[in-house]
Amino acid sequence: MLAIFLAALANVIGLGVIVPLLPYFALHHGAGPLEATALFSVFSLAQFLTAPLWGRLSDKIGRKPVILISFGGSALGYLWLALATDLQMIYLARIFSGVMNGWLATSQAYVADVTDDEGRAKGMGMLGAAFGLGFIFGPALGGYLAGEIVINYQLPMLIAAGGSAIALLVSAVLLRKPERHVSQGVSTMRFLPQIISTPILFTLIILYFGMFFVFAGMESTLALWCERILDMGPRHVGYYMAFAGICGVIVQGGLVGRLVPRMGEARVIVMGLLFTGAGLIVLPLVTERIWLLLPLALLFIGFGFVNPSLQSLISRTAPVSMRGGAMGIAQSANSLGRILGPAWAGYAFASIGVAWPFFSGTAILVPIVLVSLILVGQIRDAK
């Protein structure tokens, strides 16, 4: 398990390195706000379309080869991005990186292969910890490497490629072949009619989509808003994103596990949505950099409450026979939110107003909060 944790950490740090830089890189090459945020959408779309293919391939040739191919492809994608000289090359590099981003689902399948039921939660938690730490150190490192007066775009991207190369090396040397094999090949879409006919479960998945639609839209326009309103470059955006990552890790790493047994997932979800909504309202009102810490803390604390609690509630609400399918469809809803959210946010930023990605996100959260409050009562009555 240590090998998969170290490999994931190295790769996620690389991803985190380019996140604060990517919108500025697109603007540098003549993109408008919509084109800049669409870079997030095309990455997620490519990942969404190819994820089932990676699953079937890993069933056929094994988890380790697919993980190695994916990490190698990620390194090439970052190199391609570093060498990009126009917006078209940037788009092609991000699409290629999305296609090659099959390592996460395959790593989760690897954990399922090498652990028993008791150890699986710990293994998945280690992958989650790798993501949390990666999105603390990655943005801070990317911001630092980018510089302040003259922005160095290539160096952070080369470091990101190095992170994926380290992940490839660690996996090649330390990752052992699983003794057993849990198939990923069955399509989760066959469970969709059953999920639609289960109102509470279907509603939870719609909420999951809505949350990621709002949050991905906010993430994709944050740097653009900081550049436009607060005159911030990628260095400071990277530092602020690292702070946000710390807030998220504190919540998901400790607070959620303590609050859910006392309050239940549904109430924790409502609380998280209220935090998130407050952050979206406060963010466009900020006029000085230091005050940006407040809405970022609210947003990432809120998301830290909602995301694991919704996952847990979906898993617990689904019948055992369709639990895997329900979680698969929930992940598809997550991906669709990450595709459509940045596209809408970029359009709103460019065509309606720079604050509208956040105001519209708040408007979307209002019915989500109301539905969540109704679910609290329904779940309590069901018990």
Language-model features, listed with the residues they occupy:
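Residue-level signature of mid-helix packing/kink "hotspots" within the transmembrane helices
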Residues: G16, S44-P52, G102, F135-I136, ...
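Short amphipathic helix-loop junctions that connect adjacent transmembrane helices
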Residues: P20-P33, S220-H236
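Helix-breaking motifs and short loop linkers at transmembrane-helix boundaries and internal kinks
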Residues: G30, G62, L83-Q88, V150, ...
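Helix-to-loop junctions at the C-terminal end of transmembrane segments
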Residues: A51-I61, V251-E265
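Structural signature of the two symmetry-related core transmembrane helices
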Residues: P65-W80, R267-V282
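Cytoplasmic helix-loop-helix junction between adjacent transmembrane helices
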Residues: A93-G132
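C-terminal membrane-cytosol helix-exit motif in multi-pass small-molecule transporters
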Residues: G162-R180, V371-V376
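Juxtamembrane intracellular "pre-TM" segments in multi-pass secondary transporters
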Residues: R176-L207
